[in-house]
UniProtKB/Swiss-Prot annotation:
Domain of life (superkingdom): Eukaryota
Protein name in UniProt: Cyclin-dependent kinase 11.1
Subcellular location: Nucleus
Kinase in keyword set: yes
UniProt organism field: Caenorhabditis elegans
Gene name in the database record: cdk-11.1
Keywords, in A-Z order: ATP-binding, Kinase, Nucleotide-binding, Nucleus, Serine/threonine-protein kinase, Transferase
Family annotation (InterPro entries): CDK, CDK11/PITSLRE_STKc, Kinase-like_dom_sf, Prot_kinase_dom, Ser/Thr_kinase_AS
């Protein structure tokens, strides 16, 4: 068919009959065509007729392309384009379906899918063994179709999103290439991707097809670009302006010399209208003048006015001056504080003991030696307790840790000594604990009063016992047992404040009770249940010690001074009476009671000792007897003792500030004996002027001069 048509093309023009014959000849060569081939033939026939009509018009006159297309049959070209577009759309759909089945994606998407499957395989290792085997067996026997379905199911959500994105892109391309929307001369996409059959007829009928084909390819390259080609627009000129006033950058500069100040003249400013420049400059000038006025007003209050100026001021000016004076004082204080070196315990650790000056040694206890020290920075007097570390070869002593922990927990009370900080010496064996310094310990004070035959008054006894019970109540509410209450662990300041110290044996207790060791508390203040070997105890052991301390406040000596545990329990039973099951239920079950046999002493002989000597009245003796009850369950608690009527009857407790002061042994400030004092006074009075002048040159006081045992005497007559 192509040869025949080609020969007719050389003859000049084809007739309708020759065209029909050629069509019949071509149709006769083909075997029985289907219905779809008839449709294709009709389309081809229409296209050939349209091209023949174009050929005739082009030979008849030299009209333009628009004029030649105007004589076409009605809607013929549009129908042709619609058919081409429908076919192309069907082909694209089939191609997309094939791509979805074959998983045609980019390398990044395939790598993500492989990573996702790898994560699934790694997570599968944590499953049970039988589930893994079952899954492996299932995959071993599955068919290729099952594998395909499973791979499709295992695709990640990213593939679905990519598929959706491709669908949207295809929709956008189809919408942008429609002839109704694209009327621009640059967008002739309706002639792109023409089917092969149509290109065949173009090649036959048009001798200039090759040139047109090249043009079409160029158009395709332009139209396939996703970026819309816009017409070039002329760029608008940017208006620049600068502010000539020096107020701009310097007003808001944070530093005296701005690093960018050298480039302010050349740096472009924000675009704006020229008529707005004057407004900007006026605003900046107003701000500068307002600030200058404010500074000048503040300068008036920088100095304290004199008396004459103060009297001439109004009330408002005086008030402003007072506020300025307060502000200057606070700023001065802040400046002084800022000059001090900052100490961060969490970053810098503990301070060194060299920052304290050791004044003198105070006492030595079970767990350390106590010194009186002075802070070199603040001149504050503190108590420095050096912890004993001789036997600690494997770290910090547990007793010291307990003491620090208990003091930090219970130290927020006026009747409990407060720890300030932990200090380190030259090595780790020298660890100190800085606590508030209290001048007296009650043991030394009671001994001094006993030697001088002096006693506390009843009001003073009530004050001391009330403060002791207040501190004990605070500890017991925090579930803390002191377990070593005695007069040497009670401190008293010059202001009459009693404080509880030495928490080396303190422990926390709970409910139900824990088993503790029974070898606690100094022997003279140890409760009978501890002496009999019980290990389940709580606050009553401290209250027994409080009863012994109350009796010592009155007697100025210990109540039960035993020399051993057997003698101690015997002394207790002699004064309080031998207990029975009716007096103390459960006493016969204690280990000490089972191991020993005790004599039967009459019940409670303390009445004769305190009442007969008129040391206590009946109310006070009831309180003492309640604190020294043998049965720990019936013994008074700290709250019950504080609520006792003995503290509310006359004589009332003496206020702490009215307590008498005593010379503190810890301060070592005893006055010299009278004989030595007179001798020093005589020595100072008999100093001759020349010796006094010499001592002044050497900055030596006369009382510091000690007479020597040997001196040379010269006879003035010989010289």
């Amino acid at each position: 068919m192509s040869d025949h048509l080609g020969s007719s093309h050389d003859e000049g023009e084809l007739s309708d009959e020759s065209h029909k014959k050629s069509q019949r000849a071509s149709s006769s060569d083909e075997p029985n065509p289907a219905k779809s081939n008839k449709g294709l033939e009709s389309k081809m026939r229409e296209s050939i007729l349209s091209r023949l009509s174009k050929r005739k018009n082009s030979e008849s006159d030299d009209d333009t392309t628009e004029q030649r297309f105007s004589i076409q049959p009605k809607n013929a070209q549009k129908a042709k384009e619609d058919r081409y577009r429908d076919k192309e759309r069907d082909k694209k759909r089939e191609k997309d379906k094939r791509d979805d089945r074959r998983d045609v994606r980019g390398p990044d998407a395939r790598q993500k899918d492989r990573d996702f499957k790898g994560r699934q395989e790694r997570s599968g290792r944590d499953q049970k063994v039988h589930e893994h085997r079952h899954h492996h067996h299932h995959r071993k026997h599955e068919t290729d179709g099952h594998r395909t379905n499973r791979s499709n199911r295992d695709r990640s959500s990213e593939r679905d999103s990519e598929k959706h994105k491709r669908h949207i892109d295809r929709h956008k391309k189809s919408s942008t290439t429609s002839p109704d929307n694209d009327k621009s001369p640059h967008k002739k996409s309706k002639h792109t991707d023409v089917p092969a059959d149509a290109k065949l007829f173009d090649r036959i009928l048009d001798p200039n097809y090759k040139k047109k084909d090249d043009d079409v390819l160029v158009i395709e390259d332009v139209e396939m670009s996703p970026i819309e080609i816009l017409e070039e627009k002329e760029e608008k000129e940017i208006v620049e302006f600068t502010i000539d006033s020096p107020a701009g950058p310097k007003k808001y500069s944070k530093f005296e010399s701005d690093p960018e100040s050298d480039h302010d003249d050349t740096k472009p400013k924000s675009p704006g209208k020229a008529e707005d420049d004057d407004d900007v400059i006026e605003v900046l000038d107003d701000a500068l003048h307002s600030d200058d006025d404010a500074d000048s007003d503040e300068d008036k209050y920088l100095k304290t006015p004199e008396d004459r100026e103060w009297e001439e001021m109004t009330e408002t000016e005086q008030r402003l001056h007072k506020e300025a004076m307060k502000k200057r004082a606070s700023m001065k204080q802040k400046t002084l504080i800022a000059q001090l070196p900052v100490f961060y315990p969490g970053l810098m650790g503990c301070r060194n003991i060299d920052e304290y000056e050791c004044v003198n040694r105070v006492d030595e206890g079970t767990f350390g030696v106590v010194y009186r020290g002075k802070d070199k920075r603040t001149d504050e007097i503190v108590a420095l307790k050096r912890l004993k570390m001789e036997k600690e070869k494997e770290g910090f002593p547990i007793t010291a840790l307990r003491e620090i922990n208990m003091l930090l927990k219970a130290g927020n009370h006026p009747n409990i000594v407060n720890v300030k900080e932990i200090l380190l010496g030259s090595n780790m064996d020298k660890i100190y604990m800085a606590m508030e310094f209290v001048e007296h310990d009650m043991k030394s004070l009671l001994d001094t009063m006993s030697r001088r035959n002096k006693r506390f008054s009843i009001g003073e006894q009530k004050t001391l016992l009330q403060q002791l019970l207040s501190g004990i109540e605070h500890m017991h509410k925090l579930w803390i047992l002191h377990r070593d209450l005695k007069t040497s662990n009670l401190l008293m300041s010059h202001k009459g404040i009693l404080k509880i110290a030495d928490f080396g044996l303190a422990r926390e207790y709970g409910d139900p009770l824990k088993k503790f060791t029974s070898i606690v508390v100094t022997l003279w203040y140890r409760s009978p249940e501890l002496l009999l070997g019980t290990r389940l105890y709580s606050t009553p052991v401290d209250m027994w010690s409080v009863g012994c301390i109350m009796a010592e406040f009155i007697l100025l000596k210990p109540l039960f001074p035993g020399r051993g545990e057997l003698e101690q329990i015997k002394k207790i039973f002699m004064e309080m009476g031998t207990p029975t099951e009716s007096i103390w239920p459960g006493v016969t079950e204690l280990d000490g009671w089972k191991a020993l046999t005790f004599e039967k002493y009459p019940y409670n002989q303390l009445r004769k000792r305190f009442l007969a000597g008129r040391l206590l009245n009946d109310t006070g003796f009831k309180l003492l007897n309640g604190l020294l009850t043998l049965d720990p369950k019936n013994r008074f608690s700290a709250t019950q003792a504080l609520d006792h009527e003995w503290f509310t009857e006359e004589p009332y407790p003496v206020p702490p500030e009215e307590f008498p002061t005593f010379p503190a042994k810890s301060e070592q400030n005893k006055a010299p004996p009278p004989a030595k004092q007179k001798q020093q006074e005589n020595r100072i009075s008999h100093v001759d002027p020349e010796t006094a002048k010499l001592l002044k040159q050497f900055e030596v006081r006369p009382e510091q001069v000690k007479p020597g045992g040997f001196s040379l005497k010269f006879d003035p007559t010989r010289f």
